[in-house]
Regions:
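A short linear hydrophobic-aromatic micro-motif
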Residues: 52-57, 100-102
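C-terminal binding/interaction regions
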Residues: 35
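C-terminal structural segments of small proteins and small subunits
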Residues: 72-107
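Short glycine-/aliphatic-rich beta-strand segments at the starts of folded cytosolic domains
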Residues: 16-27, 32
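N-terminal amphipathic/basic-hydrophobic helices that include classical n-h-c signal peptides
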Residues: 1-14
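Short, charge-patterned binding micro-sites
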Residues: 17, 55-76
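Hydrophobic residues positioned within well-ordered beta-strands of beta-sheet architectures
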Residues: 18-22, 68, 100-102
Length: 107
């Protein structure tokens, strides 16, 4: 993408997409209603704290497994790495659920 600033000079606008997936296990959850409360709380915290898109992306009908995906657009890969490390630490520290799997991708 090429954009033109006030000076009329053309510069290239680079961006990176940082995407993450978390697979969590919450053994104390016995209903979809309980699970929904956890998912809503965690996704809202991720959105508010890190300004990312966050949603439950899989296993919606399974009580004890939570799969949450996040995505953000950042100006460069160093910022993407930093953001993903912060999100990872936050997810691990903000819920009693065990993190079974975590994936990170920068495009």
């Amino acid at each position: 993408m090429i954009r033109t600033g006030f000076t009329g000079m053309r510069e290239r606008a680079d961006m990176q997409i940082a995407a993450m997936t978390f697979r969590l296990h919450a053994p104390w959850v016995h209903s979809l209603k309980e699970k929904r409360m956890i998912v809503r709380s965690l996704t809202a915290q991720l959105r508010n704290r890190f300004h990312v898109s966050a949603a439950e992306i899989d296993e919606q009908d399974t009580h004890q497994i939570i799969v949450i995906g996040t995505a953000a657009i950042v100006p460069h890969s160093a910022m993407a790495d930093s953001l993903m490390e912060e999100i990872s630490a936050f997810v691990e520290g903000s819920t009693e659920a065990e993190v079974l799997e975590e994936t990170m991708e920068i495009r």
